[in-house]
């Protein structure tokens, strides 16, 4: 089997790395506008340098890591090749581009998976939501999960929920990074060294998230366990509530969701 990656930006490179780590035995073909980026990736992780044309002509599975605005131009350049190929599995990570839109850019025989990864996939801790086109085969989902087993949590959704998953998990790391930065800044403000504060803030978020997953308790229950009557934690929680912390986070996710939907139009 040949698996092609067109576009080695942050997400494309992260997923290519995960596929290589899965050790499926497939031949991994890599193409990017910057050849230097391809060469650097191969030096670090492996794979084989290729071209867009070669990938469209030879690969059985193609990951498309290009921006939404570039999709139409990219696929139109290789329509002749795509029309001659038997059914391929094409995997899009472009925010907002629906399966219907993607299908309109491709010959009808090709199957499509629309996915939305996030950046922690680069260390195997990502969240990857995905939806399959109606002509996908039963084994396509299994193959997709096999290829990306090293990338993190894989969640199959109805396509109507992919934009919502993008707002939450696709954009969510940026919101969490802001929170970590704010925690660290507060630590510095109260006397901690910067490096120490940053490590403590990041580990606090990692540990709290892991406890939610492993304990299977509601976050509100875990929060209450930390808040003793009249104590320091409840004083901090009260300040967050007074400044609409939860509402602000919900609004950020909702705005990201709405923006994602606009990107596909």
Feature map (PLM): residue ranges:
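NAD(P)+-binding Rossmann beta1-loop-alpha1 motif at the extreme N-terminus of oxidoreductases
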Residues: 1-57, 125-126, 188-189
């Amino acid at each position: 089997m040949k698996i092609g990656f067109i576009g080695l930006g942050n997400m494309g490179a992260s997923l290519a790395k995960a596929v290589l780590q899965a050790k499926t035995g497939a031949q991994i073909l890599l193409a990017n506008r910057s050849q230097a980026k391809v060469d650097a990736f191969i030096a670090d992780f492996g794979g084989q340098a290729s071209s867009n044309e070669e990938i469209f002509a030879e690969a059985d599975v193609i990951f498309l890591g290009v921006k939404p605005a570039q999709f139409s131009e990219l696929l139109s350049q290789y329509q002749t090749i795509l029309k001659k190929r038997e059914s391929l599995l094409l995997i899009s990570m472009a925010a907002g581009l629906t399966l219907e839109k993607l299908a309109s850019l491709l010959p009808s025989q090709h199957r499509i998976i629309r996915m939305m990864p996030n950046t922690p996939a680069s260390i195997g801790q990502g969240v990857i939501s995905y939806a399959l086109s109606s002509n996908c085969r039963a084994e396509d989902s299994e193959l997709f999960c096999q290829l990306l087993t090293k990338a993190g949590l894989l969640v199959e959704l109805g396509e109507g929920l992919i934009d919502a998953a993008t707002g939450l998990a696709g954009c969510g790391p940026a919101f969490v990074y802001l929170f970590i930065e704010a925690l660290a800044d507060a630590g510095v403000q109260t006397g901690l060294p910067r490096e120490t504060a940053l490590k403590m803030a990041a580990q606090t978020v990692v540990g709290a998230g892991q406890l939610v997953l492993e304990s299977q308790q509601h976050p509100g229950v875990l929060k209450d366990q930390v808040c003793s009557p009249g104590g320091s934690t409840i004083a901090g929680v009260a300040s967050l509530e007074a400044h609409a912390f939860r509402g602000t986070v919900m609004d950020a996710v909702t705005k990201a969701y709405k923006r994602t939907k606009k990107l596909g139009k």
